[in-house]
Amino acid sequence: MISSPCAQKSTILIVDDDEDMRFLATVVFEDAGIAVAGEAKDGPEALTRLDELDPPPVPTVVLLDNQMPTMTGLEVAARILSDRPEQIIILFSAFLDPDVIAEAERLGIAACVSKREATNLPAIVRRVVASRT
């Protein structure tokens, strides 16, 4: 598969407490030519990984599950965006109710994606990254 130039330089940090979902997302991104910069199983680990991957712009996108132990994806996003307002975040959740979507928009999260759309993630990442460059 031929990737777009913006996808080739994009990197992803996948944050999800479900190991199978992290694996699926990794396969989907790698098959599309998008590099996975790392994985995290919860919010605190995601924040640590971002510090390890510093300086920005690595990763280009943080893919965040919303329902995780310790911190929700929205809580993690708020922490990330307070330190890195330019960070592109995609909220990826099985449960996207209107309140979650409204809070995501308020925080500046780039997109909210249902887990049922996992195979569409590369196209969504390309679109979001292209809109920010």
Q: What kind of feature is each model-predicted range?
A:
Residues 1-11, 119-133:
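Non-catalytic signal-transmission and effector/linker regions of two-component phosphorelay proteins
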Residues 19-38:
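Two-component/phosphorelay signaling modules centered on CheY-like receiver
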Residues 39-61:
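Acidic, metal-coordinating helix/loop segments flanking the phosphotransfer/catalytic sites
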Residues 42-45, 72-76:
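Acidic catalytic/metal-coordinating carboxylates
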Residues 64-65:
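Active-site residues of response regulator receiver
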Residues 68:
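Receiver (REC) domain active-site loop signature in two-component systems and cognate sites
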Residues 74-85:
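Short amphipathic alpha-helix used as the core "switch/output" element in two-component signaling
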